[in-house]
Amino acid sequence: MENYPPYMITDKMLNYVSDIMKKIGEFNYFEGLNRYPELRRKTRIKSIHSSLAIENNQLSLFQVEDVINGKMVIGEKKDIQEVKNAYEAYEKIDEVNPYSVNDLKKIHGILTFLIEKDAGKFRNHGEAVYDGNIKIFVAPPHRLVPKLMDNLFNWMIENKDNVNPLILSSVFHYEFVFIHPFSDGNGR
């Protein structure tokens, strides 16, 4: 599909990409997270906390770390399960194909295990985002979700070798959020 998804690369974007790639190169030069497993672990915990906080998880960073370490935490059962699920998803991430719709569903199933009745399945109903009582976004109709996701993944596969990975992942994320393929957990 020509001009899908719709995006334009600006000079400002290219400057950001250049700066980020330079930082990644510097980080890789020093062997980054592989050389420092404790840094990798702490980064993962912070990432889990931040990602879940966006989804209204109320656990603090310290509580998230305690859950991951197997300690008892006082908090909502759902919040605790979200942390366990996110950690499990991180553990499995190297086993999945980033260009597979089915693997995306598998990871979603892990992320929403024991939380959502339709874990790992595309939504089968309308979806909207609200700010209080005000509808601020309406997702595409559920019947279009499988085709939209196939189009998005096909675009990624076709462009993975000729679009910078930062741009590819950013466009993917934008379109993913627009499609809102799952009932819950789209932000994780």
Annotate each predicted stretch with a short phrase:
Residues 1-188:
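FIC/Doc superfamily catalytic core
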